[in-house]
Regions:
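A "functional boundary" signal
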Residues: 21-316
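Hydrophobic h-region of N-terminal signal peptides that target proteins for export
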Residues: 13-21
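Bacterial N-terminal signal peptides that target proteins for export
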Residues: 1-8
Length: 316
């Protein structure tokens, strides 16, 4: 089942930073470190991102910027999540969690926990993911950490989604959104809105889906969440057959991706396929669909291509 559980939720919680340098950036780390972090984010799904993360960690250690150290360790977690390598991700997450707890930036502890669970879900291990979520819930309430509690609610939504109980999952997502808006006003609610948009899009309630998509785009606080919101909005517009609006959104999304790097590879590939379909480049669209790593997503796209090309025999 298609799902964007490979999201790395980049946090905007500031905490207490002891860096001596100026902090005129969204993450409140030393300004001299922020460009390095931006490069690491851009390349986090490529091996180069690991090297940049090492540089960031070393520089942050030298400057005694503990928050930047924690941020540096989110990059390997993101990389191994993107490559679906749970063994390596578990090792990277263990280091990230240890550093986060030592430096009292527990938001990054729970971010690492969430991504461990997401990787298990991506590999079809929903029962083990549920066990991990229960462990995270116990720790979050022990810490009385609001972001940790929110992460539990959100992650349980992901688990029920992957177990194909979308109604229960959607209730968790709505509860997570409500909790976030009430208790974590500085957090980025984009992905909550995206999840709800996807649910109503798949139910065929396009107008409701578009309403949530617009809220996601408006709420986006990071480059990553902005790209994610545009990708989702494009999907909604395509499903509603609003082709002119889709083309405009596609162009905007492409420009942002060129600027900030590829985020959510499968979603980007799907958009390329939609564009090829609209341009009647069906053979190329099939080739692109063959390159999708998720077999179910690939089959869905081939079905869409056959329908739009009028090849109903193969479509059904």
């Amino acid at each position: 089942m298609r799902r964007h559980t490979n999201i790395l939720i980049l946090l905007l919680l500031t905490g207490l930073c002891i860096s001596a340098g100026a902090q005129n950036n969204p993450y409140k780390i030393d300004d001299s470190l922020y460009p390095i972090f931006q490069r690491a984010i851009k390349w986090r799904t490529q091996p180069q991102g690991l090297l940049i993360a090492d540089t960031l960690y070393a520089e942050a250690t030298q400057k005694k910027d503990k928050k930047a150290q924690c941020l540096a360790l989110t990059i390997p977690v993101s990389f191994y999540l993107s490559t679906n390598n749970y063994e390596k991700l578990e090792q990277a997450a263990a280091r990230a969690k240890e550093e986060a707890r030592k430096n009292n930036y527990l938001q990054y502890y729970y971010s690492a926990c969430t991504n461990e669970i997401n990787c298990l879900l991506n590999n079809g291990h929903s029962l083990r993911a549920l066990q991990k979520a229960e462990e995270m819930k116990i720790q979050a309430f022990k810490d009385q950490h609001e972001y940790g509690i929110f992460s539990c609610i959100f992650t349980l939504g992901n688990i029920y989604y992957m177990r194909q109980n979308r109604e229960v999952a959607t209730e968790y997502y709505k509860n997570a959104l409500e909790y976030m808006l009430k208790n974590l006003p500085d957090q980025d609610p984009t992905y909550m809105y995206i999840n709800l948009s996807e649910y109503y899009r798949d139910k065929g309630e396009g107008e409701v889906a578009l309403e949530y998509a617009e809220k996601a785009a408006k709420a986006a606080k990071t480059n990553e969440s902005r790209v994610a919101s545009l990708l989702n909005k494009c999907e909604v517009l395509y499903s509603m057959k609003r082709i002119n609006d889709f083309n405009a959104c596609y162009d905007e999304c492409t420009q942002v991706i060129e600027q900030y790097g590829v985020i959510r590879k499968t979603a980007v590939q799907r958009l390329h396929i939609y564009k090829l379909i609209l341009n009647k480049n069906y053979d190329q669209a099939h080739t692109e669909a063959d390159s999708l790593r998720n077999l179910l997503s690939a089959n869905q796209m081939h079905h869409e291509i056959y329908l739009k090309s009028g090849n109903y025999e193969k479509a059904y």
